[in-house]
Amino acid sequence: MQIMLCAISNIASGNCSEDCKYCTQSAHVRTDIQKYRRKELSQIVLEAKMAKKNEALGFCLVTAGLGLDDEKLEYVCEAAKAVQKEVPNLLLIACNGMASVEQLKELKKAGIFSYNHNLETSKEFFPQICTTHTWESRFQTNLNAKEAGLMLCCGGIYGMGESEENRLSFRKSLQELQPFSTPINFFIANENLKLQTPRLSADEALKIVRDTKEALPQSVVMVAGGREVVLQERQYEIFQAGAGAIVIGDYLTTKGEEPSQDIIKLKEMGFTFASECH
C-alpha cells in the first residue's frame, strides 16, 4: 500500500486574535509557546529539505491569525517561491486562515498546490468552541479556494465534546466540499486551554477514521495531530481503517513522532511512500 507523508512548518506563530478554545496560539490564553511574526526563509527551506529527505510529498506553510492581509500574503508567497526553487518536488500547501479568491489565486501563482482551511467541527457545535468568527466564514474560504483553482485540504478536530450527531453533520458538510484531502486531528487537552475534555479512546479514534473514509471515499484521509498520543501502539491501524496519509514530525506547537521512527516502522509493515500526486 502506498501512503502520503506530509510535514508542516509553523512560519508565523502565536498572538492570534481568535478565541478558538482548542488552540494554544490564541492570544486569549496564556501559554509558553514560541511566538514570532515570521520565520526566516532560510529556515523554512531547511525544514522543507528535511521533509523531503524524510519521504514527505506535502509541505504545509502555516501562519497563525484570522486570515491573510497584504503583508502576510506577500510573505507566504515569498516562502513558497523559496521552497520551490530549492526543493522543487514538494507539493506546497498553505494554511493561512480566511482568504479571498483573489488572494488564493496569488498563492497559486506562487506555487501553492493546495489550501488547508479546516471547518474543525459541525456548524451546530462550532459556536461552543469559537465566538470571534463564524463557521460560515470558514466554509466560504473553502469555496474560495476551489474557485481559485487550488486543491482543497479540509477536515477538523475530534474529541472537543461534540456529539455523534455533530460528527455526522460535520461529515455531511465535508461531503458538500469534496476536499482532495481531509485531515483528522484528535484533541489533546492542555492545562492552559479553556477546553478540557476526556481523551478519545483508540477504538473511537479508529471509528472516526473509518466513518470519514466511508463518507469521503474519493478524499485522502490524513491523520494528523493527536495520532501518537491517542492511538499509541495502535496508530498504524489507521491505514486499515481507511487513512491514506499522515503528518510526520512536529505539529504547530507540539512534538510529534520522530520521522525516522515512523518511516522505519511503516517500511517494516510493507508501506511505500507516494512521490507524486495522482
Curated annotation (Swiss-Prot):
Keywords: 2Fe-2S, 4Fe-4S, Biotin biosynthesis, Iron, Iron-sulfur, Metal-binding, S-adenosyl-L-methionine, Transferase. Its cofactor is [4Fe-4S] cluster; [2Fe-2S] cluster. InterPro entries: Aldolase_TIM, BATS_dom, Biotin_synth/BioAB, Biotin_synthase, Elp3/MiaA/NifB-like_rSAM, rSAM. It catalyses: (4R,5S)-dethiobiotin + (sulfur carrier)-SH + 2 reduced [2Fe-2S]-[ferredoxin] + 2 S-adenosyl-L-methionine = (sulfur carrier)-H + biotin + 2 5'-deoxyadenosine + 2 L-methionine + 2 oxidized [2Fe-2S]-[ferredoxin]. [4Fe-4S] cluster binds at C16, C20, C23. Residues 1-227 form the Radical SAM core domain. SMART domains: BATS, Elp3. It is an enzyme of class 2 (transferase). Pathway: Cofactor biosynthesis; biotin biosynthesis; biotin from 7,8-diaminononanoate: step 2/2. Its EC number is 2.8.1.6. [2Fe-2S] cluster binds at C60, C95, C153. GO terms for molecular function: 2 iron, 2 sulfur cluster binding; 4 iron, 4 sulfur cluster binding; biotin synthase activity; iron ion binding. GO terms for biological process: biotin biosynthetic process. It comes from the Bacteria. Belongs to the radical SAM superfamily. Biotin synthase family. HAMAP family: BioB. Catalyzes the conversion of dethiobiotin (DTB) to biotin by the insertion of a sulfur atom into dethiobiotin via a radical-based mechanism. This is Biotin synthase. The gene is bioB.
